[in-house]
Amino acid sequence: MFEVFISRCSRYFAISLFFLLHFEGDLSWDAKAEVGSLRPDEFVNPIGEGADPWVIRDPHQPRYLWCMSEGNQAIAIHVSDSVSSMGKKTVVWEAPADGPYSKEVWAPELHFVEGKWRIYFAASDGQNKNHLAYVLTAVGEDPLGDYDLSGPFATGEGQDGRSPNLWAIDMTVFEHEQKLYAVWSGWDQVDSDRQYLYIAPMDSPTSLSGPRVRLCSNDDYLWERVEPVKSKRGLNEAPQVFMSKQRLSVTYSCGASWLPTYKLGMLELTGDDPLSPASWTKRKDPIFTGTDSTYGVGHSCFVRSLDGRQWWHVYHAKRDRNPGWRRYVFAQPMKVGSRGLPVLGSPVDSNTIMLRPSGSKQHVQPTSMDDYEYFGHHQMLRATPDSIRLGVQPNAPINTYRSGEKVVFSGAVSGDFEVGVTMQFHDGASSRDAGILFRTTGPSIGYDALRGYFAGLVPRTNLLILGKMDGMNWQELYRREVDIDVTQPVRLKVSVHGDRISVGLNGQEGFHFHDSTYKSGSIGFRVVDADATFSNLSVH
């Protein structure tokens, strides 16, 4: 088991009332890349890797529950105490090896409906044309426990919805005037590949009670089409319901999810009957579009801060401009307009310093080896109570990319300390590097996306190195040639006394270096184009 000793820990300052009031109603933030550690009440985007993010506040305790697809073959729930972090994950359901819902598990959403936790998702037999909507219902009260499957929902034509049953993804549910409804993205006919938004009443959380109704056309405006020309088809998907001030609206993603032009549109319920298309009014312009630096934005959800004072907008964005689905997750504050409609502003840039949501818990020290944040592709982490493996190459990769995978433990260590860990490389002498992060703040997705220090081993060049990062750039501080036997575990140690940093290997002193850029922060592990297991962590 891991053994963690803490000698000196920082005490976080409380967020001042001024910043709470300023942040609640203001969409501005500090975009400067400042030198030095971030404060405990600050973070940067992107907060994690993934697509189609969904997060909900637990009505029973002060925490957030994130629901995400796990390699398109399972569903995971992450638990965190802030919208600014996704937390540790637990896989709650795995698809069977074969059958109609064994593959392409997409866009799961966790809802608390009629006293039970339920997960709505889409799945297929491996052929996209066979996607249908399903629901999992928790067996007990624990959202991290076992679930029973129901479905598929009758999302097709005819009074029974099964004449025939038709393609459906991105289902979400909502209650309006004591009636339950489902909204989803579906095809108009078999094999059409034309996606529209549909709605149907529900007689229970696991069953639709009436025929589907198409809410609107998918190509009223050029910006809804996969490309903004009349010859291209329209595409509406990922509906999300927003309710505030007795107003109900539905945001939706449109355009092409694989292109940088993905964006959000909005429907407003302006009539009395949600099942009547005439009751919905479409906004003539998109409500959220990409920028030069943050693009391919969509599949949003909306959630309040733990103290209820702020609304937050969570969405995914593309990692690069090439066609495809490699994405990561952003979170930023939003406003609610005078009529109760969402006002989203513009996507924030990566590495922008932002205040954490009001009411977020402040970690004052590392609590356990189980209390960490992971930053990297979700399929490249393997964790047990005794070890953490980073850089794992999955057998069935889904939109994978390397990003300097890392874990950062909750709570900061300040003052003098010593940290050690045992590392085992799994990809031999070709490994680039792996090692210890310390005095780390502002971790994010990306090779050098943190502020703090890194001490590690480079097997391919037999080096012991020390460097620091400012959130975007790497600066090497010192290097020394060492003998590295990648077939055996190695023990890496870092000691910090004032501005003196000492790095050692296998019980032998390596080198010392003086630097005072970062004075406090968390510890963690990182790999760079490597596959390594970390175990036997000690912190004194």
Regions found by a protein language model. Name each.
Residues E34-P59, S84-H111, L144-E175, D203-Q240, ...:
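Surface loop/turn signatures of beta-propeller and other carbohydrate-active proteins
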Residues A51-G71, W106-N130, L136, D170-D193, ...:
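Hydrophobic core segments of beta-strands in well-ordered, beta-rich domains
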Residues S80, A133-E141, Y196-S204, K263-D272, ...:
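Beta-propeller blade signature
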Residues E34-G36, P342, S346-H540:
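Extracellular glycan-recognition regions
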Residues P201-S207, S257-L259, E268-G271, K335, ...:
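Short edge-strand/loop segments of extracellular domains
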Residues G234-K284:
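Loop/turn-rich, solvent-exposed surfaces of beta-rich toroidal or solenoidal domains
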Residues K263-V336, G504-A532:
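Aromatic sugar-binding interfaces of carbohydrate-active proteins
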